[in-house]
């Protein structure tokens, strides 16, 4: 996701061992670098993909990131999640897991959780999402060695775990039906992602993969049945299901307490108060005026 410390994390992992260019055919910046770590002797290339909110191809950045994940077959995805805004960030996570590429979540800005009164049961969250989660602070360099270890470990696994079911029984049934009619050229771990995208009538996927007449009819029948029942378009139905899943797991893994204020925060709240702000401002201006006037009167002529 944008604004979750992605660039800071990339710089921390690669240092000066990076080069910048453009993705083929577009003006979107491409950044790659060699992993800067004593933890592994292997040469590991880290690619900094454009920050995106979802895997739907609505922006150039989303198209670039999606094409890379699906076509370049990276060994592992490090998914940066803002620990202080976890519910919104997990939407992309659910989509990345469906691609069949192994995912390791970097729960970034974890150092800010205590200050904001947030507690996250990382172990349980990892179990519910079925992927490793490492708490990090890219800015402070915390948790990076653990993140590297886990990413390399996951990348070396010989077998790829199949994405788990996260939707309602009804929608999962439709996904299963579509998976069963996909071409044999689609690998087992990617079938779920393509099935969901065919149900959503994703134009890029429909154009890139031609289905047989019978398969296309199956997809259309499943889509129409769901849209008719819910009186909504398929993409909105899937989006709603994702957020229901996210809200369910967040409700059992994230506790939000009272935010702990620093001295600076407390002062800010007082001086920006709608009732106290103006009197405080007038008092400060009077003190400044008095100090300047007094100094002027006491200076020798």
Which sequence ranges carry the predicted segments?
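Conserved small/polar residues in nucleotide/adenosyl-binding loops
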Residues: 295-301
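Conserved C-terminal guanine-recognition region of P-loop GTPase G domains, centered on the G4
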Residues: 68-72, 76-132
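Loop-to-transmembrane-helix entry motif
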Residues: 270-274, 278
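Hydrophobic core segments of alpha-helical transmembrane domains in multi-pass membrane transport
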Residues: 281-290
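Alpha-helical transmembrane helix bundles of large polytopic membrane transport and channel proteins
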Residues: 114-257
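Switch II (G3) loop of P-loop NTPases
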Residues: 45-57
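Conserved G1/Walker A P-loop phosphate-binding module
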Residues: 1-47
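Cytosolic juxtamembrane amphipathic/interface segments immediately preceding
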Residues: 256-269
């Amino acid at each position: 996701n944008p604004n979750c410390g992605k660039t800071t994390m990339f710089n921390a992992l690669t240092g000066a061992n990076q080069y910048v260019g453009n993705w083929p055919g577009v003006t979107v910046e491409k950044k790659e670098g060699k992993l800067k770590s004593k933890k592994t002797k292997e040469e590991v290339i880290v690619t900094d993909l454009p920050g995106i909110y979802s895997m739907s191809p609505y922006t150039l950045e989303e198209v670039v990131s999606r094409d890379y994940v699906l076509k370049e077959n990276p060994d592992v995805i490090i998914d940066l999640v803002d620990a202080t805004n976890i519910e919104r960030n997990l939407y992309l996570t659910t989509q990345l897991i469906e691609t069949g590429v192994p995912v390791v979540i970097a729960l970034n800005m974890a150092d800010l959780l205590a200050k904001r009164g947030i507690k996250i049961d990382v172990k349980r969250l990892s179990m519910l999402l079925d992927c490793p989660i490492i708490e990090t602070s890219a800015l402070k360099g915390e948790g990076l060695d653990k993140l590297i270890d886990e990413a390399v470990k996951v990348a070396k696994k010989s077998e790829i775990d199949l994405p788990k079911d996260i939707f309602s029984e009804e929608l999962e049934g439709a996904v299963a039906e579509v998976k069963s009619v996909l071409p044999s050229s689609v690998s087992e771990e990617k079938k779920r992602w393509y099935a969901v995208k065919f149900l959503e009538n994703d134009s890029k996927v429909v154009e890139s993969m031609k289905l047989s007449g019978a398969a296309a009819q199956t997809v259309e029948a499943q889509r129409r049945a769901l849209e008719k029942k819910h009186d909504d378009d398929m993409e909105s139905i899937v989006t709603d299901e994702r957020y229901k899943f996210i809200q369910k797991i967040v409700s059992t893994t994230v506790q939000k307490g009272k935010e702990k204020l620093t001295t600076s925060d407390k002062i800010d709240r007082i001086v920006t108060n709608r009732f106290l702000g103006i009197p405080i401002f007038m008092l400060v201006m009077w003190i400044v005026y008095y100090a300047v006037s007094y100094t002027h009167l006491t200076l020798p002529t």
